[in-house]
A protein has these predicted regions:
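N-terminal cationic leader/targeting segments used for protein routing and processing
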Residues: 1-3, 147
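Short, surface-exposed interaction loops/tails
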Residues: 128-161
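Alpha-helix exit/C-cap motif
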Residues: 36, 52-73
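Type IV pilin-like appendage domain
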Residues: 68-132, 147-149
Length: 161
């Protein structure tokens, strides 16, 4: 009788089943990693937008002379607005209108410029010529509502001059 070498059909089926199960597990890990990557990418885009907006605001505020009350601005703006006077005769206000966009308005022109869509501002001023600014943006990922916020403390360079 001849000696037969090789795998039986059952051994081949078991090996194929183990291989398919391994591929399924690896694909599950891949999908989970991909979802995590996409979530983090979207989150970082939102945070980058907030920091770019904060940089625009900081550059202007640092050149300001003094903080003002929102009631001192020529037009009606929300109470949580950031209002400050510049070295010339202008007063600048940053405010959110109906949680839809962040606007910048100068008292000399009274036309609002959109700074960032979907970004809300909240500002607290201190008597020492500084303020705490918080920017917030709501965003959605796969049907889940998320909110990101950043904060920065800014000092006026020309305070008291």
């Amino acid at each position: 009788m001849k000696k037969l070498e090789g795998f039986t059909v059952i051994e081949l089926l078991i090996a194929a089943a183990i291989g398919l199960i391994s591929l399924g597990v690896l694909y599950g890990f891949y999908q989970a990693e991909l979802k995590t990557y996409q979530f983090n990418k979207k989150r970082m885009e939102v945070i980058d937008e907030l920091w770019l907006t904060m940089d625009k605001i900081e550059k202007e505020v640092r050149e300001g002379k003094e903080f003002k009350s929102y009631t001192e601005f020529p037009l009606s703006i929300p109470p949580d607005s950031l209002v400050f006077a510049t070295n010339d005769t202008a007063t600048i206000a940053f405010f959110t209108s109906g949680d839809t966009a962040l606007y910048r308005m100068v008292s000399t022109s009274l036309s609002a410029q959109t700074i960032a869509v979907g970004v809300a501002i909240s500002a607290v001023t201190f008597p020492s010529g500084s303020c705490q600014i918080s920017l917030t943006k709501n965003w959605t990922y796969r049907g889940m509502n998320k909110e990101e916020s950043i904060s920065s403390q800014i000092h006026l360079r020309n305070w008291g001059r």
